[in-house]
Amino acid sequence: GKRVDYSARTVITSDPNISIDQLGIPRAIAMNLSFPEVVSRNNIKKLTQKVKNGRYKYPGANYVIPVSSSNTQTWRGRDLRYSRNIKLRYGDIVKRHVLDGDPILFNRQPSLHKMSMMCHKAHIIDDDRYSTFRLNVSATPPYNADFDGDEMNGFLPQCIQTQTELSIIADIKKQIISPRYSKPIIKMVQDSVLGSYKITNDDTIINWRDFMNLSTYLKGIDYNIIEKGKNYSGKKLFSKIIPDKINIKHKKTEIKDGDLINGFVNKTVVNNLIIGYSWDRYGADKTRNFIDNCQRLISNWLLMDGFSVGLGD
């Protein structure tokens, strides 16, 4: 295909610690791409510091396009490789580096349906040792991506209107339900599914220290209900991440008011039922939080209680 400005392409690697709507971006890419921010009363101090940092210090800026006396931009931008002693004025345009939270349009080819391009929030990896995009593994099914060397493309929108449009229309958390199947397409996969089954088995017991430790990885948890010195079931810990007022009966599994009472959580329960009901009742944000919490909980619990595969399997 053709080459375009304000884009980046590199290999993707998995990261279960970032949210499904975040995209880990290497610092080298964040410094190469730029967003044109107009200088105003609200941001002149921040942008002045970025101009002082220049092109080679993050977070900095690459160019300054000064406003002319007739209040129109002169497109002869000043390259901050050669000049950093610039006094900003209201109306100037500073082409600053990519920052945490900036919307990024992310794409994997071949682009076969609308979810082949979705909007993520930038999460800058401030370490020169890493040079790949980081993607949550639960966000891979819509892209049909895996981590065996796939490359993906990022596109940085160049105005606030485009940022807003992407955030409203193409935000990945609003694409959790597939328009083709009307079922969740962004869901638990691989270790998260297996771990959800293991942690909700009847014989899983967790002491209060591990219970507290695992709870620190979760968002929106009430710590006051955890009693010191008491053992808890794995069902109790998993119940803490299920949204309130979710009621499910499926074969032997029973969830009442967000509390797992009987049975276990398998692939059907966690993906089709919990995520599906959460989407219908609470919408995108709470469903995104459940997926993030489930992934963090299971990933860290499996470090304590793993599993093995033998020849018999």
What is each model feature region?
Residues T13-S14, Q22, Q109-L112, N136, ...:
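Flexible, glycine-rich loop/tail regions that form catalytic "lids" or insertion modules at the edges
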Residues G1-I176, F238, I242-D244, K249, ...:
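Core mixed alpha/beta domains of very large multi-subunit molecular machines
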